[in-house]
Amino acid sequence: MRFKISALRSSIQIVSFLFLFGWASVAQARQDVVKDQFEVRDGGTLYLDLDYGDVALRTHDENVLLITMQRDVDGVSDGELKDMLSRQDYRFERDGNDVIVEVEFREDATDRAWKRWKRDYDLDLDLEILIPERFNVEFRTGAGNVELAHLIGNVSGRTGAGNLEFDAISGTIDITSGAGNIDNSDTDGDVNVESGAGTVDLEGIRGRIEASTGAGNINASILDQLVGDSSFQTGAGNVVVYIADDVGADVEGRASLGNARSEFDVRTRGKFISKSFSGRINGGGPAITMSSGVGNVSLRRN
């Protein structure tokens, strides 16, 4: 009798293990990887357009552009993954010395299976593109992060919702995020960055700077002499600008509802809840304008 009970317990354990193993094999993450490459020359442009996904742009010293697109879905079978990915169109194409990368889902609001999949499953799309060091980039994403480093070329684009991170760029930058943070450092060229709602961090920019956010803080470190007028503006948040002692500028700061402070010897004014300062620092130079609708404005020594 004791043997029968022990055997029964073992059978239950085996069945339980098989059930759990079978469930895990069905529910495990499914992955699909697509790769392509194109021969290009210096000075071309990457045109990137996708509705969803994170983008990592890397550079190298070869005249080839390499694309790796990885798509992951949790909790689906191979058949379900194949069906869902068949609804996603993508195009990798060379046009002269330029490369076009487009990724887009064909959404059908009347398709019940599509609506269920959108509700129950999470698709992760990661796009990694290796480009020549001397290249230009134009991008548009509906939602997703974009990062790029060590490029000699111009960058422009926007994401509807996502963070933008750019480092060591020799060229102009003109980027926008509808809702996300922007981090830009070590840039030789004019910079225009805008976020609808997010923090903007800038450091080591050697060019004109136009930085704005609808709701968020702006932090900037100016380490080298600017070559043109610059402005930092937030609708709701704090603006903090650090300036090195050998950088000359004509500065003006205004907080409509908040405080305005400067560690440099400038003229300050206060009227009711509005505060401001203005003056010439380190012998003067290009204009630096700082403003906050609701928040504080600070000018500090670096």
Give the label of every model feature segment:
Residues R2-N302:
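Intrinsically disordered, low-complexity terminal regions
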